[in-house]
């Protein structure tokens, strides 16, 4: 019976009443009750009886207990025991109180008084307490103590004493800083003034230096105050006065001191006319006379952003006229500061350009540059005035969001006739950074200036001025330029331009150029003032300020709207450094076409970028001075400069004819430009998007651009060298600068190096070679994705100039350009050989300089390719132009990518490459160039394709290295090349090549480039490539450049470095770098930085881990970075309609289970890419392929992740032609696939979108979307390879797939999943979580999370990478294919999970992967797609079927791929395989995302699927 009442059966109701619950079977439930006596059967009853108790007796000693039950009355008191009493008490109290209150009412007065007294007393007490407490309050520590003891203890405490000491210290420090700052400011102003005067004097002298052209164009508007005012007035009134004032820059720079800058009225009339053989017009009138008639007086008003009033005032004063002087006392200060800045800038540039800038290199550089800018601006204004058009001006105050305060303190909107617009264009060119070159005319003018070769945009002039200002004193720079120019007619012209630009008389030079340009630039639209200063009408319209041309950006709109930034805010050094970054980023914005867009784009970023771009542009413009080079340079500028829109147009026009004739010169300048083009590239891209879309003469434009770019690079080298020189070597390298210039002249490689240094601020200035290269790379990556591609080409070209590349990158670049020129002139085989040689040199150099050299070399190859294909590299340069249209950008990217790859390819096989280039040029130019700046697009596509190709090559090489890498690579490249011959094929092959290159940039690029003769991949190349790649990777990961350039172009740069190191692999790296790196640099700079840091660590670890792996890792890393970074601000159309609008800013997640989150993706990509690369490398080596094979494959995978994205460029071309939107998406999508596995929808959108190219280019140029696309593009080509990929042996397959890519890749490419940064973040987190949980909950999580992940986009990227796997693998050897397949398998798994492949692709992965179909059993995710990725079925619909290669196929078997049941593969991808499925589902698959080293390829096939 005991169990009957077991307590555990007792339940209590909510009121606490308990009910005994008996288990079943206890039918007689006995309720013990106190109401009745205990029954006999009760336990207690029996117990009591045992004790002698008898029923009826009371308990107790004397039986006194009651016998009857105790009646229990349960009192359910609602309030509990005693509660009622309490309540009643309360009630009574309340009643009493109420009574009291009633009494109170009666006794009101008395009570009130009492109450009042009481209150007063309370208050007094409180006050006394407060007073007392106030004594115990420590203000220093912000602590209130209640007791004296507490307070005393505190006062005597260490905490308090420490705070006191800290405070005192801070105060002292602050006082010191303030005093030192004020002193510094004073000194700076004095220096600036001094510099301005010096510059003015130099300009005067420079006028007398016809040899160098006005070596020292009056950068500063230093004219008598009367003259200055007169000048301004003249600018307003007549062109004649304008010319004089422009030359003289009559506007005095009033300093804060109230003194006006000593007007060194340098009559630029002579100086300008003295521009080396430019025009005899001399002064600004050169442009004015040319542009003067058409240039109506454009009223330009500068709206000053609401920044520091002093700064604005300073600016106002800097540009204010003498008339404005009194009113601009603050302006005087600003003027002084601005002048100082201008001087500094000029000095910087000049220092770079010449020894003259040595002193100015530091502050005066900025000041000098500013001064030159001011001079140009003033001149422009004067010319504007000369135009005598009613001053119509728009004030634009940069949006609050404009982060680039220095860049756009205000905008000058010049609304005037084409004439002024032309002037503006020139200025825009000069100041593309600041002024968005929305107006085609300005750009045209600027470009035109470059185009005629005679006209140098003001920016160019300004840059040149700065550079020349430095170079002018030491004509060596000019001579160097001349020497360089002597190298080739175009080069000579470039030199001429450069010299002119270099000379402080840049002002006159631009004018001369303008004059010379008229013919070339005849139909180029408005001529923007090319003087150092542009006369800008102040808001009151009474004063014409001399605005630094560099700060002016002219829109291409009929009424040229000039954007300008406060020169004081215009950090020319920064501008140059950031020019590359911002330029690329903002170019796309520029393409947006709206000045506002540009402003916004430029404003936040362009200020620095603009400044840099401006200088770059100046260089570019200078480069444009050459008539032949002018076109290319112009084109380069066009794409490079924010004001590149009009420039792009002009460049397109000018470049089309001069392009061919001056491939070398242009290339040379273009190379230089390429550097600057980094930032400008995006701008230019957008411009090109708008302008170059219809630019049939893309080749010419490209060439021009190249030339200009070269020039720009030269100038930029000099300027940037000076600029960055201060960082690496004092900008005082005015003396070094000319040598550098000389070196540049001597070696384009050095030129490239210099721009690199510029880009990297001498981060890697450790050695002229590697450091410069790295710098170049960094710069490239930083702001000049397009430039990057150009540089890449330059590097590729410079591959032929490898040894030079060891020299400063800037010189390297120039050298590359020159080399490109030479190579271009050479027979393809010669070119190839030279490129090969140089590539090998570069390889060695790359080994030395790692990423930078690699990049340089890669670029050199690209540039070679570019030059060979009508300056395809400059097409990349056109990136800014390509901002003209995403599509254009796509085209540009393809071109550039192709160039990248092509250069390598050319190194491999010139003829094939040439055909590729031609094909690309025709097809790509047709579809892309016109779509968006050919240069940019070329770059984008080129990067992508080159990367694909490189990647393919890398894969091939990986395999080749493992097995017959060289042959395979060669074959793949050959095939790719031959494919490239066809536009689509070419694009695809390029995309793929780029993909591949990206993947295998290190091995493949080297291999590819080195294989200038297709099969010519020397063991040294391979070894060097591998070593370089590893080294590059390690170096990059360890070097600040890795972060700087590895950040923006960081991954790309890194990859480029390693890619350049190993040309084959380097190409993807480079392209990836350029494509993504730039994107990352510009767009995801911080994110990329983090990613780069993470990647750096990972790379360091894994590079140590797997020295071979570095290729893969780096590629992978670079790809994620690129991919992630690139999409930061891709044009909307880039991704196409499908691409989510935010995709532009969305980091791209590698679709291949690269598992890169945006930045984290990048990081993860890096990690996973590295690890995956490791895995693949492990696997591949296990399979019998060397690390190179593995690394390339790893890269390929990562790059495949990015590669297929890159691959899409080929598809993109076809799509481009067919559907701009769709084509772009494929291009971008593959990249996205690489970078954004997370967003299937995005990936698809990205891939098919015609904007893809743009985005790529944008990524590349703008926010470096191009690089991202590069990253992505490589994936696309791989993916594209899927369809047409017949599984030849890896390479050929890739080649064929390359061709097929164009047609087939689009779907897959379109599928690549792009994610917004949020998505990427989510994806990265998801991936991390997944990876962490994958092994724990592989099946459950994979199955459950796989779709979720896919939805999140982690899985999809993994899946998509699988398609990527096809082309890359096909291109690569079987192992690479297998690895690619594995990677793609992961991608496919992710895609399968994500449903990336809505429709099985006609050509199964096996074709691409060259893996037995059983292994690649295509996993058609079309069914999965919708369920997994419900959001974007279309995204996946276009994607190729996910061909998953079973891990067994990819894993250590001798490359024999054991057929794995589709179910095995697919399920493995999805969920069946615990680790693999989970990893795949989460994109954390070790293979896909070797983030966890432990998960290296060692993962069993199950994992490897």
Swiss-Prot record:
Stretches annotated zinc finger (C2H2-type): 136-160
By its UniProt entry, which SUPFAM superfamilies does this protein fall under? beta-beta-alpha zinc fingers
GO MF terms listed in the record are: mRNA binding; zinc ion binding
Where does the record place Polar residues bias? 437-449
Pfam annotation, one family: G-patch
Show the ranges annotated as biased composition (Low complexity).
872-900
Q: Where is the composition biased (Basic and acidic residues)?
A: 166-175, 182-206, 322-339, 421-436, 575-612, 648-665, 688-702, 745-767, 1017-1031, 1050-1063, 1097-1112, 1163-1185, 1211-1220
UniProt record, GO biological process: hemopoiesis; mRNA splicing, via spliceosome
Question: Which residues lie in Basic residues bias regions?
Answer: 666-687, 703-715, 794-804, 856-871, 923-932
Per the record, residues carrying Phosphoserine are 648, 733, 735, 753, 915, 918, 985, 1013, 1018, 1037, 1039, 1085, 1179
Which residues are reported to carry the modification N6-acetyllysine?
Answer: 479
Tell me the domain of life.
Eukaryota
Keyword Zinc set for record: yes
- Domain G-patch, by residue range, is 40-86
Q: Which UniProt keywords apply?
A: Acetylation, Coiled coil, Isopeptide bond, Metal-binding, Phosphoprotein, Ubl conjugation, Zinc, Zinc-finger
Q: Where is this region: Disordered?
A: 166-244, 322-393, 419-537, 575-1304
Which portions of this protein are annotated as coiled-coil regions? 89-124
Q: Where is the composition biased (Acidic residues)?
A: 223-233, 832-849
Numbered residues of crosslink Glycyl lysine isopeptide (Lys-Gly) (interchain with G-Cter in SUMO2) = 311, 573, 1109
Protein name, UniProt field: G patch domain-containing protein 8
The species this protein was found in: Mus musculus
């Amino acid at each position: 019976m005991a169990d009957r009442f077991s307590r555990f059966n007792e339940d209590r109701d909510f009121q606490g009443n308990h009910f005994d619950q008996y288990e079943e079977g206890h039918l007689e439930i006995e309720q013990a009750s106190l109401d009745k006596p205990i029954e006999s059967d009760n336990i207690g009853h029996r117990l009591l009886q045992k004790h002698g108790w008898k029923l009826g007796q009371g308990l107790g000693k004397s039986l006194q207990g009651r016998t009857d039950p105790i009646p229990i009355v349960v009192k359910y008191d609602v309030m509990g025991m005693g509660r009622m009493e309490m309540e009643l008490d309360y009630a009574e109290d309340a009643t009493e109180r109420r009574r009291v209150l009633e009494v109170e009412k009666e006794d009101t007065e008395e009570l009130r008084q009492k109450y009042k007294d009481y209150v007063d007393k309370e208050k007094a007490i409180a006050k006394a307490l407060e007073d007392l407490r106030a004594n115990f309050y420590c203000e220093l520590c912000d602590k209130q103590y209640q007791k004296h003891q507490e307070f005393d203890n505190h006062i005597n405490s260490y905490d308090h004493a420490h705070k006191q000491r800290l405070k005192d210290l801070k105060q002292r420090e602050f006082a010191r800083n303030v005093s030192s700052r004020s002193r510094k400011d004073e000194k700076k102003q004095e220096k600036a003034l001094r510099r301005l005067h010096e510059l003015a004097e130099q300009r005067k002298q420079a006028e007398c230096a016809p040899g160098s052209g006005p070596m020292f164009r009056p950068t500063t508007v230093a004219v008598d105050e009367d003259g200055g005012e007169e000048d301004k007035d003249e600018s307003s009134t007549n062109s004649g006065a304008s010319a004089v004032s422009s030359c003289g820059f009559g506007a005095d720079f009033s300093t804060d001191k109230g003194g006006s800058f000593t007007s060194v009225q340098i009559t630029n009339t002579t100086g300008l006319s003295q521009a080396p053989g430019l025009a005899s017009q001399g002064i600004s009138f050169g442009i004015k006379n040319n542009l003067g008639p058409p240039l109506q007086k454009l009223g330009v008003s500068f709206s000053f952003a609401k920044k520091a009033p002093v700064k604005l005032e300073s600016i106002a004063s800097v540009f204010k006229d003498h008339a404005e002087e009194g009113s601009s006392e603050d302006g005087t200060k600003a003027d002084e500061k601005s002048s100082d800045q201008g001087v500094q800038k000029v000095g910087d540039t000049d220092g770079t350009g010449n020894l003259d800038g040595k002193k100015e290199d530091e502050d005066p550089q900025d000041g000098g540059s500013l001064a030159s800018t001011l001079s140009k601006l003033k001149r422009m204004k004067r010319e504007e005035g000369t135009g005598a058009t009613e001053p119509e001006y728009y004030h634009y105050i940069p949006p609050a969001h404009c982060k680039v305060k220095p860049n756009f303190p205000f905008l000058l909107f010049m609304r005037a006739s084409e004439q002024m617009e032309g002037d503006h264009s020139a200025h825009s060119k000069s100041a593309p950074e600041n002024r968005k070159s929305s107006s085609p005319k300005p750009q045209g003018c600027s470009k035109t200036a470059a185009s005629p070769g005679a006209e140098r945009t003001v920016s160019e002039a300004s840059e040149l001025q700065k550079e020349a200002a430095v170079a002018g004193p030491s004509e060596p720079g000019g001579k160097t330029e001349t020497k360089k120019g002597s190298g080739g007619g175009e080069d000579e012209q470039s030199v001429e331009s450069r010299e002119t630009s270099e000379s402080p008389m840049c002002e006159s030079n631009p004018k001369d150029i303008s004059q010379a340009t008229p013919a070339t630039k005849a139909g180029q639209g408005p001529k923007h003032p090319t003087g150092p200063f542009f006369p800008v009408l102040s808001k009151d319209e009474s004063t014409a300020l001399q605005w630094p041309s560099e700060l002016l950006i002219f829109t291409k709109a009929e009424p040229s709207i000039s954007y300008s930034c406060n020169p004081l805010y215009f950090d020319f050094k920064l501008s140059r450094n950031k020019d590359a970054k911002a330029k690329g980023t903002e170019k796309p914005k520029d393409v947006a076409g709206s000045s506002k867009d540009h402003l916004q784009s430029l404003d936040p970023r362009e200020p620095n970028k603009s400044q840099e771009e401006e200088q770059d542009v100046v260089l570019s413009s200078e480069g444009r001075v050459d008539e032949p080079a002018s076109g290319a340079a112009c084109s380069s500028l066009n794409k490079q400069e924010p004001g590149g829109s009009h420039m792009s147009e002009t460049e397109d026009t000018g470049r089309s004819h001069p392009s061919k004739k001056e491939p070398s010169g242009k290339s040379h300048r273009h190379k230089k430009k390429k550097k600057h083009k980094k930032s400008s590239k995006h701008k230019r891209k957008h411009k090109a998007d708008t302008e170059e879309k219809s630019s049939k003469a893309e080749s010419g434009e490209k060439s021009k651009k190249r030339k200009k770019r070269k020039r720009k690079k030269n100038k930029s080298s000099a300027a940037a060298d000076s600029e960055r020189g201060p960082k690496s070597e004092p900008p005082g390298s005015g003396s070094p600068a000319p040598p550098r210039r000389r070196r540049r002249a001597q070696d384009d490689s050095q030129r490239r190096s210099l721009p690199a240094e510029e880009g990297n601020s001498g981060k890697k200035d450790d050695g002229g070679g590697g450091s410069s290269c790295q710098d170049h790379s960094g710069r490239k990556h930083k702001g000049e994705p397009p430039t990057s591609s150009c540089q890449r080409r330059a590097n590729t070209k410079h591959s032929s100039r490898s040894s030079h590349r060891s020299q400063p990158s800037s010189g390297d670049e120039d050298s590359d350009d020159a080399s490109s020129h030479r190579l271009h002139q050479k027979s393809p085989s010669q070119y190839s050989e030279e490129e090969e040689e140089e590539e090998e040199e570069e390889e060695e150099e790359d080994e030395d300089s790692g990423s930078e050299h690699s990049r340089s070399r890669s670029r050199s190859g690209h540039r070679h390719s570019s030059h060979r294909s009508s300056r395809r590299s400059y097409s990349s340069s056109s990136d800014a132009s390509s901002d003209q249209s995403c599509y254009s950008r796509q085209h540009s990217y393809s071109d550039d990518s192709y160039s990248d790859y092509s250069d390598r390819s050319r190194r491999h096989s010139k003829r094939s490459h040439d055909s590729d280039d031609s094909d690309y040029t025709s097809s790509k130019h047709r579809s892309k160039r016109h779509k968006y700046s050919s240069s940019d697009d070329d770059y984008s596509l080129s990067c992508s394709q080159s990367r694909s190709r490189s990647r393919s090559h890398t894969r091939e090489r990986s395999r080749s290295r493992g097995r017959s890498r060289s042959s395979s690579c060669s074959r793949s490249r050959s095939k790719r090349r031959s494919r490239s011959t066809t536009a689509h094929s070419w694009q695809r092959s390029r995309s793929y090549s780029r993909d591949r290159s990206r993947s295998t940039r290190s091995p493949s690029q080297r291999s590819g480039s080195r294989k200038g003769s297709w099969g010519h991949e020397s063991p040294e190349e391979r070894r060097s490539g591998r070593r370089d790649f590893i080294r590059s990777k390690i170096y990059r990961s360890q070097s600040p450049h890795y972060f700087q350039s590895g950040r923006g172009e960081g991954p790309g740069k890194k990859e480029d470095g390693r890619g350049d190191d190993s040309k084959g692999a380097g190409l993807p790296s480079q392209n990836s770098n350029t494509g993504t790196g730039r994107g990352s640099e510009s767009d995801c700079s911080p994110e990329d930085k983090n990613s780069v840091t993470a990647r750096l660590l990972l790379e360091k670890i894994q590079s140590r881990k797997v020295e071979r792996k570095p290729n893969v890792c780096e590629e992978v890393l670079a790809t994620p970075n690129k991919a992630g970074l690139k999409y930061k601000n891709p044009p909307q159309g880039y991704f196409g309609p499908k691409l989510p609008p935010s995709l532009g800013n969305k980091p791209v997640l590698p679709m291949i289970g690269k598992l890169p989150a945006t930045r984290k993706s990048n990081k993860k990509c890096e990690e996973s890419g590295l690890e995956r690369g490791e895995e693949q490398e492990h696997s591949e080596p296990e399979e019998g392929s060397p690390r190179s094979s593995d690394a390339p494959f790893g890269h390929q995978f990562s790059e495949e992740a990015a590669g297929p994205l890159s691959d899409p460029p080929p598809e993109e071309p076809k799509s481009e032609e067919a559907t701009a939107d769709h084509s772009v998406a494929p291009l971008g999508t593959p990249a996205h696939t690489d970078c954004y596995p997370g967003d299937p929808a995005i990936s698809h959108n990205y891939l098919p979108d015609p904007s893809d190219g743009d985005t790529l280019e944008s990524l590349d140029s703008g926010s470096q979307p191009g690089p991202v696309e590069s990253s992505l593009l490589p994936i696309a080509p791989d993916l594209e390879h899927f369809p047409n990929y017949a599984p030849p042996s890896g390479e050929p397959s890739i080649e064929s797939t390359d061709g097929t890519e164009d047609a087939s890749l689009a779907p897959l490419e379109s599928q690549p999943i792009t994610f917004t940064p949020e998505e990427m973040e989510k994806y990265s987190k998801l991936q991390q979580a997944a990876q962490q949980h994958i092994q724990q909950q592989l099946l459950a999580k994979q199955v459950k999370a796989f779709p979720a992940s896919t939805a999140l986009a982690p899985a999809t990227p993994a899946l998509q990478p699988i398609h990527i796997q096809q082309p890359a693998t096909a291109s690569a050897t079987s192992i690479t294919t297998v690895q690619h397949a594995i990677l793609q398998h992961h991608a496919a798994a992710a895609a399968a999970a994500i449903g990336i492949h809505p429709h099985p692709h006609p050509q199964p992965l096996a074709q691409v992967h060259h893996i037995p179909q059983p292994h690649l059993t295509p996993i058609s995710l079309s069914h999965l797609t919708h369920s997994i990725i419900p959001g974007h079925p279309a995204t996946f619909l276009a994607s190729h079927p996910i061909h998953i290669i079973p891990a067994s196929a990819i894993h250590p078997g001798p490359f024999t791929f054991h057929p794995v049941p589709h179910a095995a593969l697919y399920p493995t991808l999805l969920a069946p395989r615990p680790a693999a499925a989970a990893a795949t589902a989460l994109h954390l698959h070790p293979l896909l995302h070797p983030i966890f080293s432990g998960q290296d390829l060692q993962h069993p096939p199950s994992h490897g699927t």
